[in-house]
Amino acid sequence: MEFVMFEDVQGQEIYVNPEQVVWVRELGDKRTIISCGHDHTFTVRLSPAQAVAALGVKVR
């Protein structure tokens, strides 16, 4: 299992399994929400493109 580390907007480290990411959405102001399911969302200080690139996922 592989994990990618992010820092959320509160400065806490978040480790995400890229295979569990459901969606990535721009919040504005260079912030992005990453969802790993029902109640598992967090906000990072990255653009959506940067977050997806960090996850190593191809975009179509």
What annotation goes with each model-predicted range?
Residues 1-15, 19-60:
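Acidic, Ser/Thr- and proline-rich intrinsically disordered linker/docking segments
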